[in-house]
Amino acid sequence: MAVPPTYADLGKSARDVFTKGYGFGLIKLDLKTKSENGLEFTSSGSANTETTKVTGSLETKYRWTEYGLTFTEKWNTDNTLGTEITVEDQLARGLKLTFDSSFSPNTGKKNAKIKTGYKREHINLGCDMDFDIAGPSIRGALVLGYEGWLAGYQMNFETAKSRVTQSNFAVGYKTDEFQLHTNVNDGTEFGGSIYQKVNKKLETAVNLAWTAGNSNTRFGIAAKYQIDPDACFSAKVNNSSLIGLGYTQTLKPGIKLTLSALLDGKNVNAGGHKLGLGLEFQA
């Protein structure tokens, strides 16, 4: 293991098996294009089949690789505008600096963040400062890795309250085909996940979570099967008897169709199930 993942990416492989390939209750359209000069456009729109609410977003990104710079502009249907400037591997190898700002003309709300990340062999360190009107908050994270073993700590300090408001700890083990992840959030929320790549076509995952003082344990299993290079099938179920099914088909290069359904196993004949449709275009 050269560089360990960020704290947010610990256990990501298992989460991807549970989340990717599903879009319950949504009709979604994604479009990604890239011009000859390297300018990337990403637009996304979705409609909620229950509330009929329509949301959308637009993002443009330009990479100035010669200087390690990335410029990103964002807009969404809540009329929030965002700007992000990133410089990587310029001031020091493995160091990434990001300035992220957003502004909502409707409400006048402004937000700014400075994000820093440093990664080298066996270590991944991050520190973000959020400049909020109520007072800046600082979020720090550290992940150490050695021979597949991972240990991470994440904290959030609010200057207005002069105290740590979040303290999370995680331990895991990672190989190319197997991943184990456990975490404790604020000493009250406990979770764990296992990811197993059975073979080139089949991936499986298990997750478990519970809260101190609550006897309700949340448990789920999921699997993803690559039928052929252009099609894959996903399925998951949890201890609430909710069954998720997903099918993704590449219709032609750059066009991908996703169909998904969420079924209530306790009330199969009662209705209330959710369906999802997604189309992704990439050029």
Curated annotation (Swiss-Prot):
Changing K20R: PRKN-dependent polybiquitination is decreased, whereas PRKN-dependent monoubiquitination, mitochondrial calcium uptake and apoptosis are unaffected. Expressed in erythrocytes (at protein level). Expressed in heart, liver and skeletal muscle. The modification Phosphoserine is found at S13, S193, S240. It is a multi-pass membrane protein. The keyword Membrane applies. Phosphorylation at Ser-193 by NEK1 promotes the closed conformational state preventing excessive mitochondrial membrane permeability and subsequent apoptotic cell death after injury. Phosphorylation by the AKT-GSK3B axis stabilizes the protein probably by preventing ubiquitin-mediated proteasomal degradation. Ubiquitinated. Undergoes monoubiquitination and polyubiquitination by PRKN; monoubiquitination at Lys-274 inhibits apoptosis, whereas polyubiquitination leads to its degradation and promotes mitophagy. Deubiquitinated by USP30. It comes from the Eukaryota. There is a cross-link at K12, K20, K53, K61, K109, K110, K161, K266, K274 (Glycyl lysine isopeptide (Lys-Gly) (interchain with G-Cter in ubiquitin)). The record marks E73 as: Involved in ceramide and phosphatidylcholine binding. Critical for channel structural stability and gating. Keywords: Acetylation, Apoptosis, ATP-binding, Cell membrane, Host-virus interaction, Ion transport, Isopeptide bond, Lipid transport, Lipid-binding, Membrane, Mitochondrion, Mitochondrion outer membrane, NAD, Nucleotide-binding, Phosphoprotein, Porin, Transmembrane, Transmembrane beta strand, Transport, Ubl conjugation. The chain crosses the membrane at residues 26-35, 39-47, 54-64, 69-76, 80-89, 95-104, 111-120, 123-130, 137-145, 150-158, 163-175, 178-185, 189-198, 202-211, 218-227, 231-238, 242-251, 254-263, 273-282. Non-selective voltage-gated ion channel that mediates the transport of anions and cations through the mitochondrion outer membrane and plasma membrane. The channel at the outer mitochondrial membrane allows diffusion of small hydrophilic molecules; in the plasma membrane it is involved in cell volume regulation and apoptosis. It adopts an open conformation at low or zero membrane potential and a closed conformation at potentials above 30-40 mV. The open state has a weak anion selectivity whereas the closed state is cation-selective. Homodimer and homotrimer; in response to cyclic AMP or calcium; oligomerization is required for scramblase activity. Component of the mitochondrial permeability transition pore complex (mPTPC), at least composed of SPG7, VDAC1 and PPIF. Interacts with SPG7, NIPSNAP2 and SLC25A30. Interacts with hexokinases including HK1. The HK1-VDAC1 complex interacts with ATF2. Interacts with BCL2L1. Interacts with BAK1. Interacts with RTL10/BOP (via BH3 domain). Interacts with amyloid-beta and APP; induces VDAC1 dephosphorylation. Interacts with TMEM41B. Interacts with BCAP31. This is Non-selective voltage-gated ion channel VDAC1. It comes from Homo sapiens (Human).
